[in-house]
Amino acid sequence: MGGLIIEDLQEGFGKEAVKGKEITVHYTGWLENGTKFDSSLDRRQPLTITLGVGQVIKGWDEGFGGMKEGGKRKLTIPSEMGYGAHGAGGVIPPHATLIFEVELLKVYE
C-alpha cells in the first residue's frame, strides 16, 4: 500500500493553491477498475472548496497543494486518504483506491 501519487499532466501558470485558500476545480473520479463514479465536467458545474481544512478527502487536500491555476493533475489516492473502510454512498466500495483527473480553475485571494 503506497501513499498519494501526484502526476502533473499540465503545468499551471496562475496563482498557487495553498492551505486555507478557496479554490474552484473540475474533476473526474474513477475506481481502479475504470468505473467512473463522479465528474463535475459531466454536470458542467465546477466545485469550490477551501483547501486543507478537511472539507474534502485528505487526498484532495494534499493533492491540490502547490498546484497553479490552469494546471491539471492525475491523483492516485489510497483508501486511507480517500473514503477508507466505509466507502461512500454505495458507489465507492470499502478500501477503494481512487483515481482523479483534476483541473485547478481558480484560486481566490
Swiss-Prot record:
Pfam families: FKBP_C
GO biological processes: protein folding
Statement: the UniProt record of this protein carries the keyword Repeat: no
Top-rank taxon, per record: Bacteria
Reported impact of G3S: In strain: BNCV / Serogroup B
EC number(s) reported in the record: 5.2.1.8
One Gene Ontology term of the molecular function aspect: peptidyl-prolyl cis-trans isomerase activity
Activity regulation summary: Inhibited by FK506.
Segments forming domain PPIase FKBP-type: 20-108
InterPro entries documented for this protein: PPIase_dom_sf (IPR046357), PPIase_FKBP_dom (IPR001179)
Catalytic reaction(s) noted: [protein]-peptidylproline (omega=180) = [protein]-peptidylproline (omega=0)
Keywords of this entry: Isomerase, Rotamase
Family: Belongs to the FKBP-type PPIase family.
Job of this protein: PPIases accelerate the folding of proteins.
Protein name: FK506-binding protein
Organism: Neisseria meningitidis serogroup B (strain ATCC BAA-335 / MC58)
